[in-house]
């Protein structure tokens, strides 16, 4: 589905095996130079992410975060799959999280990564569709239970293109697992590094970018997730996204949603997440954005 007009897809940020780290870093830097130039052409409308294969070399990763910020990019994409490398709850990665927190660089994982499948086998695609969101989101609970958001309370993390209907049950499961029970003593201390519930770290530090897979399931659970944590996108120009029928998709899944919630989904949550220029974007939205009447349940 990589029908991108740009010359790069998301593949550089997915798997840390079967590749030469040096070549992956070279490809990532080529992408990052290009995306910085691309966003510079329309800095108000384009939010660029640097690909940072941080598993291989923490010092290199910090330098790339610094370069990306200095060149106008607003976040990084890291591998969702960690393979045999140290997982993201390892303190060795603290310099990367610190560099991102200090610069307001949002850390991202993008859908797609999963263990290698033999798609010639029966049901392989169905298995992938069930599992891909779990693999993509796996770094999130490493960051939560690993105390990364405790150590770096202003660090921002975003999951993109993973659907949202499954998130409330995952938040509930993390809270249950983190709760103190008389039966959990044998498991050792895995909570003293946390001052809040896992769901509270999610509420404060995490966002969901609902590009491509925003559907009725995601719409109905929006309050269970937290209205301030969800952003909507078109996934342009991929065929699984809303384009070229974005207006119709908006009508299908958003009609009747209260105006304040729509503003969060379509605008203010992204402004908060990425630290955008709200006044300038409101002026631009007045020129090219959808009319409010489009979403009214019973327009006059």
Predicted regions and their residues:
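Mid-to-C-terminal alpha-helical segments outside catalytic/metal-binding sites
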Residues: 26, 33-41, 63-66, 146-147, ...
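Mobile, glycine- and charge-enriched loop segments
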Residues: 36-39, 43-50, 193-205, 287
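Aromatic-lined glycan-binding groove of carbohydrate-active enzymes
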Residues: 107, 111-115, 145-203
């Amino acid at each position: 589905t990589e029908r991108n007009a740009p010359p790069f897809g998301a593949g550089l940020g997915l798997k840390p095996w079967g590749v030469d780290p040096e070549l992956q870093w070279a490809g990532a830097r080529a992408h990052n130079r290009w995306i910085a130039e691309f966003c510079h052409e329309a800095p108000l409308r384009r939010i660029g992410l640097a690909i940072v294969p941080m598993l291989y070399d923490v010092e290199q990763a910090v330098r790339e975060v610094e370069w990306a910020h200095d060149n106008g990019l607003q976040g990084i994409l890291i591998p969702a799959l960690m393979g045999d490398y140290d997982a993201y709850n390892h303190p060795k990665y603290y310099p990367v999280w610190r560099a991102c927190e200090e610069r307001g660089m949002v850390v991202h994982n993008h859908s797609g990564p999963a263990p290698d499948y033999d798609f010639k086998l029966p049901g392989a695609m169905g298995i992938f569709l069930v599992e891909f969101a779990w693999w993509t989101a796996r770094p999130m609970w490493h960051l939560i239970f690993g105390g990364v958001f405790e150590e770096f309370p202003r660090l921002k993390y975003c999951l993109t293109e993973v659907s949202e209907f499954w998130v409330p049950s995952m938040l509930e499961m993390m809270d249950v697992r983190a709760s103190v029970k008389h039966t959990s003593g044998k498991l050792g201390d895995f909570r003293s590094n946390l001052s809040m519930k896992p769901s509270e770290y999610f509420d404060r530090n995490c966002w969901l970018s609902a590009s491509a897979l925003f559907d009725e399931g995601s719409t109905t659970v929006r309050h269970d997730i937290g209205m301030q944590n969800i952003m909507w996108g078109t996934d342009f120009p991929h065929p699984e996204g809303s384009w070229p029928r974005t207006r119709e998709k908006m009508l299908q899944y958003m009609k009747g949603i209260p105006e304040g919630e729509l503003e969060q989904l379509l605008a203010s949550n992204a402004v908060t997440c990425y630290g955008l220029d709200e006044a300038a974007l409101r002026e631009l939205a007045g020129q090219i954005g959808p009319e409010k009447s489009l979403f009214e349940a019973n327009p006059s």
